[in-house]
Amino acid sequence: MVYTKHIIVHKLKHLRQAKDYVENAEKTLVNESNEDHLTNLFPYISNPDKTMSKQLVSGHGITNVYDAANEFIATKKLKALSKGTDFNFDPQTGKVRFNVESLEKNNAVLGHHLIQSFSPDDNLTPEQIHEIGRQTILEFTGGEYEFVIATHVDREHIHNHIIFNSTNLYTGKQFDWKVIPKEKTKSGKAYDVTKNNFEKVSDKIASRYGAKIIEKSPGNSHLKYTKWQTQSIYKSQIKQRLDYLLEMSSDIEDFKRKATALNLSFDFSGKWTTYRLLDEPQMKNTRGRNLDKNRPEKYNLESIIERLETNELSLTVDEVVERYEEKVDVVKQDFDYQVTVEKGQIDHMTSKGFYLNVDFGIADRGQIFIGGYKVDQLENRDCVLYLKKNETFRLLSEKEASFTKYLTGHDLAKQLGLYNGTVPLKKEPVISTINQLVDAINFLAEHGVTEGTQFNNMESQLMSALGEAEEKLYVIDNKIMELTKIAKLLIEKESDHSQAVINELENLGVGPSIKYQDIHQELQSEKMSRKILKNKFEQTVDEINTFNEIRVTTLEENKGKIL
């Protein structure tokens, strides 16, 4: 388990005393509760009583780790020399002297102190923890900033102290530590962007060595919830449960019992009904009017009672809960793209998923974390990845952690396909809609409901979805024709470089950087998508026809019995 802490170094005295304190071991013991404990920063982190006689102290970009403070200051002096600033003429010596105190102007940041703590449960050696810290800070800073790292073993939990210079070795620029002030965040709390980047890199490197990466509790990570569990997601979950309850309840009392069983709190006392998820960290109630802009009254008490009058289905609370859990699992496991990932593309695996190597740009590489529930591992250790089109994945750059890039499921599937030469399997969203509606109709039929308003509504929705599928097939056919035309022109362009072909490609919106292989992959993906959608369309139509034949036969038989 890895915990991190960040402290800003503002004063020269926090750096300058390093050499004297390292030479005098008696002065290296400090009281951490003292507000001025950073005064002894460098000697503290390199204290031999804490670092296995200094064996676990190392640095980057400096000659002597025990004189790091002066080397940090020298780097800043070089920057000032190149700019010609902060130098004063000394009349006694007749020379120009650098004004070291100028480094503290405007409460400037001189360095950054990072602490990386590990749990004894991780079963890592001090040497491994030191290496984790070294790799983390190298990747975090891109290797462009001097640093010293010391691993302390004097406590039950081994921890790294890392101090890095705020001045870039190569450019002289200040390290940009970004914090979004509380006035600009939805949570009302400041958000430390750069510390979050550091933690992501720390987790990635530590997990390679087997350290357990735990998620912070809601109380300690409100901002985390505002990122991935936003109010809009709560609304979506509430609406999903309400729509399900409107289908599965017989009257308002039945609705209330089943809503409670699905951890959905409700309050019908006000003008607008309010709802809240009891199994999620939702703090504020959600008004029903905000769940459907076109029909704001849909989830109010009167509308619910009216809607439930059309239901013929009668199920127990336990049956409704069981079916809802199955439905949630189906939705969670649904996907838009299926991509095969070769074992060589996997950086390393953890108990919760794996880090995938992804190339971007000409010579850059990073890792993306993929949750285990999105992966099926094959016998040859390759993996099949299931992605949603619009979900996002954060790319952690190996060269510079401050570089933040997000890939959608669509972009990731495309890039992985180009890398390994496979065609991502694309599934049209309407297929999921058809599957859900067919499942719902079958469920009603299994419980003896094959007529009435409830059944007819489901049937009408299914016919609408089939119409949408038919329209999508038409769009895909046109797309395939267009891509085929472009592919032919690109092949022709490669052979004779005709200006007429180039002009025609430009008219089609195809730039000079587009190659045949790019279009070929997209074309194959569209063809596979068409095949899957067409099969689903034809299969569903056949099932509907068969069902209708059985229903007509049953009705005729029942009429005969009545007569």
From Swiss-Prot:
Family as reported in the entry's similarity comment: Belongs to the mobilization (MOB) protein type 1 family.
Cofactor dependence: Mg(2+); Mn(2+)
Tagged with keyword Disulfide bond: no
Active site: Y44
Positions annotated to bind Mg(2+): H159, H161
Keyword annotations of the record: Conjugation, Magnesium, Manganese, Metal-binding, Mobility protein, Plasmid
Name this polypeptide is given: Group II intron-interrupted relaxase LtrB
Highest taxon of source: Bacteria
Alphabetical list of InterPro entries matching this protein: Endonuclease_MobA/VirD2, LtrB_C, LtrB_central
Main function: Mediates initition of conjugal transfer of plasmid pRS01 possibly by introducing a single-stranded nick at the potential origin of transfer, to initiate single strand transfer from donor to recipient.
Pfam families hit by this protein: Relaxase, Relaxase_C, Relaxase_M
A single MF term (Gene Ontology): metal ion binding
Note, other: The gene coding for this protein is interrupted by a group II intron, Ll.LtrB. Splicing of the intervening intron is necessary for proper protein activity and, therefore, conjugative transfer of pRS01, as the splicing event brings together the two conserved histidine residues proposed to function as ligands for the metal ion cofactor.
